[in-house]
């Protein structure tokens, strides 16, 4: 059933399809391609940030694979959003995943919906505004597309060219594909009920039901990241598009050693015959790194945010402090590029625990473990560290803030 043309500015729900496995992009320890890092952030974060800052977006639902809960949670640490963002699990096909997202939005107060591939991070607000104008003018289905410019050949199974195909009236479809909400929900429900699962995009489902699809001008940059080389080119593109605002922050901390059963360093507990004395868990490494992160944006130091005189922080895990500092950095437009911690202690030995410490830093900061460094040295029995009266830590954080085009 077709809706009447909209008379009010659109209220848009956003469905971001992110349940694919991305097998053509090859395997990676970062997971499927929507979670690969480009420009210091996962692909899906760049996509989300574009929608989060678009004023017509009122609800965002990300359709993820059931196995990707942890990957999305890790990526989500990069995101500061005033627009509600929820997740639902997708199905075995893109079509099933889109329907899951649409069903989630069914009870939301939205007039229209934009359905977008998570691995298309390079769309802009000008494109979204063109789509909104077309929807607001009464279009039931809007497809961003660009004219085909390559010469097209049809070949047989052996790879022999049979004919050259005319490019006239041919367009390459993009996303976000956008619709009056009830129209596309009904279309997807009918497709599911009929057993049809061979549609390659949402506009095809609208066409199947005879719903007119209006083309608006797409952009050449709005490409889908499909293979491994696409990811590398996207990373290069982002790196080259901005004049970077690179900042380095340093932090230093020291805690006294007293009799005990172990120390916590970089979030890892190490059995020992002493412990670190402090108001919180006394993780000297995380305290130094917290100060280093705060220094990159002039946000004071750990004592300003978590005063030792405040009883609520007594015995607190220092993970709270480091994640708070990382969140402030991201709120101010920063991307954490590197974290380096040097521990100065006679004992315990750090070497056997270094990889576990790096893994903790990677988890707390939401960055690749290769960007996390932990080193240790002794003080050659000199001074309070040499006398095993305390442990010191020096930390350096490198953060890139949003530059200028």
Swiss-Prot record:
Pathway it works in: Isoprenoid biosynthesis; isopentenyl diphosphate biosynthesis via DXP pathway; isopentenyl diphosphate from 1-deoxy-D-xylulose 5-phosphate: step 2/6; Isoprenoid biosynthesis; isopentenyl diphosphate biosynthesis via DXP pathway; isopentenyl diphosphate from 1-deoxy-D-xylulose 5-phosphate: step 4/6
EC number: 2.7.7.60, 4.6.1.12
Catalytic activities: 2-C-methyl-D-erythritol 4-phosphate + CTP + H(+) = 4-CDP-2-C-methyl-D-erythritol + diphosphate; 4-CDP-2-C-methyl-D-erythritol 2-phosphate = 2-C-methyl-D-erythritol 2,4-cyclic diphosphate + CMP
Region (2-C-methyl-D-erythritol 2,4-cyclodiphosphate synthase): 247-405
This protein's record includes keyword Metal-binding: yes
UniProt site (Positions MEP for the nucleophilic attack): 167, 224
Cofactors (names): a divalent metal cation
Keywords: Isoprene biosynthesis, Lyase, Metal-binding, Multifunctional enzyme, Nucleotidyltransferase, Transferase
Annotated binding of a divalent metal cation, by residue: 253, 255, 287
UniProt-annotated site: Transition state stabilizer, residues: 24, 33, 279, 378
GO biological process: isopentenyl diphosphate biosynthetic process, methylerythritol 4-phosphate pathway; terpenoid biosynthetic process
Pfam family, one: YgbB
Binding site for 4-CDP-2-C-methyl-D-erythritol 2-phosphate: 253-255, 279-280, 301-303, 377-380, 384, 387
The keyword Chaperone is annotated on this UniProt entry: no
GO MF annotation list: 2-C-methyl-D-erythritol 2,4-cyclodiphosphate synthase activity; 2-C-methyl-D-erythritol 4-phosphate cytidylyltransferase activity; metal ion binding
Positions of the UniProt region annotated as 2-C-methyl-D-erythritol 4-phosphate cytidylyltransferase: 1-246
Family classification: In the N-terminal section; belongs to the IspD/TarI cytidylyltransferase family. IspD subfamily. In the C-terminal section; belongs to the IspF family.
Listed PANTHER family: 2-C-METHYL-D-ERYTHRITOL 2,4-CYCLODIPHOSPHATE SYNTHASE, CHLOROPLASTIC
HAMAP family: IspD (MF_00108), IspDF (MF_01520), IspF (MF_00107)
Protein role: Bifunctional enzyme that catalyzes the formation of 4-diphosphocytidyl-2-C-methyl-D-erythritol from CTP and 2-C-methyl-D-erythritol 4-phosphate (MEP) (IspD), and catalyzes the conversion of 4-diphosphocytidyl-2-C-methyl-D-erythritol 2-phosphate (CDP-ME2P) to 2-C-methyl-D-erythritol 2,4-cyclodiphosphate (ME-CPP) with a corresponding release of cytidine 5-monophosphate (CMP) (IspF).
Record-given protein name: Bifunctional enzyme IspD/IspF
Organism: Rhizobium johnstonii (strain DSM 114642 / LMG 32736 / 3841)
Gene: ispDF
């Amino acid at each position: 059933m077709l809706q009447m043309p909209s008379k009010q500015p659109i209220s848009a729900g956003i469905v971001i399809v992110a349940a694919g496995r991305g097998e053509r992009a090859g395997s990676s320890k970062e997971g499927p391609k929507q979670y690969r890092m480009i420009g210091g952030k996962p692909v899906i974060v760049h996509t989300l940030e574009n929608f989060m800052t678009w004023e017509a977006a009122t609800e965002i639902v990300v359709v993820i694979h059931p196995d990707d809960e942890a990957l999305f949670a890790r990526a989500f640490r990069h995101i500061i959003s005033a627009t509600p963002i929820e997740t639902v699990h997708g199905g075995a096909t893109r079509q099933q995943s889109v329907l899951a997202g649409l069903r989630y939005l069914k009870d939301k107060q939205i007039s229209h919906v934009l359905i977008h591939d998570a691995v298309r991070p390079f769309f802009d607000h000008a494109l979204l505004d063109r789509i909104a104008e077309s929807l607001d003018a009464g279009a039931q289905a809007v497809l961003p597309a660009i004219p085909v410019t390559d010469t097209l050949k049809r070949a047989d199974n052996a790879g022999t060219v049979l004919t050259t195909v005319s490019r006239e009236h041919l367009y390459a479809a993009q996303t976000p594909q956008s619709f009056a909400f009830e129209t596309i929900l009904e279309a997807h429900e009918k497709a599911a009920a009929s057993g049809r699962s061979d549609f390659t995009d949402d506009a095809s489902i609208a066409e199947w039901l005879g719903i007119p699809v209006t083309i608006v001008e797409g952009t050449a940059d709005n490409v889908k990241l499909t293979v491994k080389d696409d990811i590398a080119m996207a990373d290069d593109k982002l790196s080259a598009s901005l004049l970077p605002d690179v900042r380095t922050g340093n932090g230093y901390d020291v805690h006294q050693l007293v009799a005990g059963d172990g120390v916590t360093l970089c979030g890892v507990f190490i059995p020992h015959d002493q412990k670190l004395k402090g108001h919180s868990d006394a993780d000297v490494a995380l305290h130094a790194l917290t100060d280093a992160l705060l220094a990159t944006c002039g946000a004071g130091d750990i004592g300003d945010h978590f005063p030792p005189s405040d009883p609520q922080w007594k015995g607190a895990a220092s993970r709270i402090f480091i994640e708070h500092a990382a969140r402030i950095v991201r709120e101010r437009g920063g991307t954490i590029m590197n974290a380096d911690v040097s521990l100065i202690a006679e004992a315990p030995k750090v070497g056997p625990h270094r990889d576990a410490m790096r893994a903790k830093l990677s988890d707390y900061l939401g960055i690749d473990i290769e960007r996390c460094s932990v080193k240790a040295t002794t003080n050659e029995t000199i001074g309070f560290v040499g006398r095993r009266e305390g442990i010191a830590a020096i930390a350096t954080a490198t953060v890139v803030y949003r530059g200028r085009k």
